[in-house]
Amino acid sequence: MKSTRIAIALVIVASASASASASAQQAETQPDSTIDLGSLLYNSDHGGLTISSGKTYNRVEGLPVYIGPTYKGRVGRGDLSLAALGIIRSSNKFHWDPENLGHRLTADLRFGRHRGFAVGASTFDEVAKIEPWQLTEPDGGLAAFFLRRDYFDWYGRHGGSIYASAFRSDYASATLAYSSERWASRSERDVLSVFRSGGTWRANPVINDGLVHVVRLNLNFDTRNQVLRPWAGWYLSADYEHGDGNFEMAGTPLGPDDVSTDVQHLSYGRAFFDLRRYNRISPRRQLNGRLVFGGWIHGDQLPLQRRLSVGGIGTIPGFDFRRIGIGTDVGQCARDGMQVAGRPAQCQRVALAQLEYRHELVSELFDIFNRNGIRVRGAPFRVKPSAVAFVDAGRGWLVGPRQGDLQYTSGSLPGFDTWRTDVGLGLDLGIAGVYVAKAVSEAKEPANFFIRIRGRF
């Protein structure tokens, strides 16, 4: 048991070190979804046997380990990437059973260096986050491994997809994808944690199981940290999803409890926008802002795995994650008197605004440290402590005929006096940040202290 904990800790800490070193250099590029641990067969650009981690740790999988052959080569003028990875999960002590096994097979062909297009296909049997936008890794995985707190909910995805994309350098891309997937509920399992090992995990909520056909369109635009404009730029991620399928409603907040099955056909449209602006107002000061809006656009109601929420260290840290019992539930959008295991996200729409001021601190001690320098996993690391002040505001709501402060018509927006708000301060040391946040809209809520490995946004 102890050796298993140590092995898992080494993988997670390695992940945290990589993220921290990137954060310390103000790197804002999106990290790969896995951590390469190296090739076991031979050192070649064309392929080998790869072992990698899913760069997460959670109450459903524990630590997912990916293993299998990979290949990279040229096909005409295109760059070909192939991977056939099996997945074994550490939950239930790496027990060999269907819940602990999965796979991801991918084939990608990319044409062009600075601009061009790419096509690809994949088949997968994996566990996915319901709201990946709220919190970056390794923050979520570290909280689960050390503190037995999982800030995500999870569901199973089994199916295949194809995509085509166009890109220009590293700052603009458009991707169109089609997939056929079976979505399934997953339960929390026997997963280790360093502290609170005698406690129980928060229940992983039941979703609306079903077979669904999904069309996704994603647009990304990122001009952050360009050579001539460090600490400044725009970031935009815009997603549209159309889903069509048959979903099981029984035993969930969207269906009756008095029947064994209640299958309903849903055809829905969902959009999600994440807009950020980074401003360097002096050589050592930044003023950054973020606006998030997402949820139901048209068609039938959203299944549970496509619902949204706000609250917790990733969005409005002055409020505890999945906090209830403080008036109308504008965090998860649970109706009065409805208690659901795991307190799942049920909002059909959410809005979030964040503003952050950062001031880099100057110290001779830090200058001495940075002159000597150290390297973390081969990357140069420098301490650049910054004082941080921030304010957040947001809420979720349901869509339909107006009902109190929880449900609004599709063309209206809740009044700002109903939003949850907080303020906070922090010290970002580069490798990690320590923060305190206090709710403003609910003055009786206690202050929350928390640690982030990566920046808040």
Question: Which ranges hold each PLM region?
Answer:
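Transmembrane beta-strands of outer-membrane beta-barrel proteins
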Residues: S81-I87, G120-F124, T175-S179, E188, ...
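Short, contiguous acidic/charged loop-to-helix segments that flank catalytic cores in large enzymes
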Residues: V263, Q339-Q346, T409-T418, V440-S441
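Positively charged n-region of N-terminal signal peptides that target proteins for export
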Residues: M1-R5
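C-terminal outer-membrane beta-barrel translocator/porin domains of Gram-negative envelope proteins
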Residues: T29-D45, A118-Y163, S193-F381, P385, ...
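Outer-membrane beta-barrel "beta-signal"
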Residues: L217-L219, G424, L429-I431, E445-F457
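Outer-membrane beta-barrel initiation region
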Residues: A22-S90, H95-E99, L105, R113, ...
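Bacterial N-terminal signal peptides
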Residues: A7-S17
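C-terminal beta-signal and adjacent terminal beta-strands/loops
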Residues: V391-G411
